[in-house]
């Protein structure tokens, strides 16, 4: 076998980051950091990419913000991310907003490898009193 026929398997060096996705019903924030979370690599929000305030939390805004964050991260050498999804939590809503799923899908389609996806919504262990009064919100 000649040297030309031997293929050298050069393994591409993988550099991982963490994509923190905060999805509320008012906005979606995509924040890509290094693995420790100490250094910000890219940060985009739904409000940065759309004009109307009502569209900040939409899946479309989340998709564009995630795509731009992924492009910026890939320029800086990140080629895989672990995803941490967070809703407002605490005494507020514990469900992620409409942009969370769209943001995850956009990160994957932008060419980033997806590692773990985990929910890091803060859950109270009997913390502060929820708003609405003793009898709750009467609709």
Curated annotation (Swiss-Prot):
What is the top-level taxon of the source organism? Archaea
Would the keyword DNA damage turn up in this protein's UniProt record? no
Q: Which UniProt keywords apply?
A: Ribonucleoprotein, Ribosomal protein, RNA-binding, rRNA-binding
- Among its keywords, does the record have Nucleotidyltransferase? no
Single GO MF descriptor: rRNA binding
Please provide one cellular component term from the Gene Ontology annotations of this protein. ribonucleoprotein complex
Region described as Disordered: spans on this chain: 118-139
One GO term of the biological process aspect: translation
User: Which SUPFAM superfamilies does the annotation name?
Assistant: Translational machinery components (SSF53137)
* Alphabetical list of InterPro entries matching this protein: Ribosomal_uS11, Ribosomal_uS11_archaeal, Ribosomal_uS11_CS, Ribosomal_uS11_sf
Q: Which family does it belong to?
A: Belongs to the universal ribosomal protein uS11 family.
Q: What does this protein do?
A: Located on the platform of the 30S subunit.
Oligomer and partners: Part of the 30S ribosomal subunit.
* Name the UniProt record assigns to this protein: Small ribosomal subunit protein uS11
The taxonomy runs: Archaea, Methanobacteriati, Methanobacteriota, Thermococci, Thermococcales
């Amino acid at each position: 076998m000649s040297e030309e026929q031997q293929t050298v398997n050069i393994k591409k060096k993988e550099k991982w980051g963490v994509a923190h996705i905060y999805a509320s019903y008012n906005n979606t924030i995509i924040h890509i950091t290094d693995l420790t979370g100490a250094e910000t690599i890219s940060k985009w929000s739904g409000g940065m990419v759309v004009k109307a305030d009502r569209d900040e939390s939409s899946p479309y805004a989340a998709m564009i913000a995630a795509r731009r964050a992924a492009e910026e991260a890939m320029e800086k050498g990140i080629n895989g991310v672990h995803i941490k999804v967070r809703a407002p939590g605490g005494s507020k809503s514990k469900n992620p907003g409409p942009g969370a799923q769209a943001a995850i899908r956009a990160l994957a389609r932008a060419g980033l490898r997806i590692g773990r996806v985990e929910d890091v919504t803060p859950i109270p262990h009997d913390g502060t009193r929820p708003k609405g009064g003793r009898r709750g919100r009467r609709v």
